[in-house]
């Protein structure tokens, strides 16, 4: 890919696209010997989600989740003009990849339940989809910063858990996105 992008005037080499979400494109980027995630906010329509200012929401949500105590990458910089965020890169497989490869461990779900205990007390849900979680040194990290007010129908037990094993919902998603 070898493209350059800047964050607050500093240049980063884009290595590859990591993924596209509701709010932006996340790239693996490097500068010197360090690797980062560089997220470029996009303004593509999303038929199932309403946004305000996406960059402001990312910053606000990051601060909220950090205060709650959620294990996640550090937000290193926010470039308001270019609508970009620079995050710490957490190296590891996503929960999605581990489910696909039959490498899931009960401990990862137990860790998520501990995360949920912190979130629910704070009246908060996160996006429990398995692509948003990376395992590094046997610990799960929430690598998205999105959070919302708690709604029972969207909590882990009622929605997220459907995608943390090879359920019909998970397999349907794989079929539609392969």
Language model regions located:
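Hydrophobic residue at the +6 position relative to the catalytic HRD Asp in the kinase catalytic loop
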Residues: 128-133
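C-lobe/activation-segment region of protein kinase-like
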Residues: 108, 120-125, 136-178
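ATP-binding glycine-rich loop module of kinase domains
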Residues: 14-17, 22-55
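Conserved hydrophobic core/spine positions of the Hanks-type protein kinase catalytic domain
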Residues: 111-118
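Protein kinase-like catalytic core scaffold
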Residues: 36, 71, 85, 141-144
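Conserved structural core of kinase catalytic domains
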Residues: 51, 70-109
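Juxta-kinase regulatory segment immediately upstream of eukaryotic protein kinase catalytic domains
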Residues: 1-15
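The N-lobe alphaC helix and its flanking beta3-alphaC-beta4 segment of protein kinase-like domains
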Residues: 50-68
């Amino acid at each position: 890919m070898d493209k350059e992008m800047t964050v607050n005037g500093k240049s980063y080499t884009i290595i590859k696209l990591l993924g596209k979400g509701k709010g932006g494109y996340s790239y693996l980027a490097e500068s010197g010997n360090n690797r980062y995630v560089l997220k470029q906010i996009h303004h593509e329509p999303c038929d199932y989600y309403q946004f305000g200012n996406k960059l402001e929401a990312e910053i606000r949500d990051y601060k909220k989740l950090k205060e709650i105590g959620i294990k996640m990458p550090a937000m290193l910089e926010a470039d308001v003009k270019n609508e970009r965020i620079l995050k710490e890169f957490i190296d590891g497989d996503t929960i999605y990849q581990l489910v696909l490869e039959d490498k899931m461990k009960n401990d990862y779900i137990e860790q998520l339940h501990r995360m949920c205990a912190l979130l629910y007390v704070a009246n908060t849900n996160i996006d429990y989809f398995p692509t948003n979680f990376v395992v590094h040194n046997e610990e799960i990290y929430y690598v998205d910063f999105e959070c919302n007010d708690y709604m029972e129908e969207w909590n882990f037990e009622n929605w997220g858990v459907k995608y943390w094993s090879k359920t019909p919902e998970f397999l349907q998603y794989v079929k539609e996105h392969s």
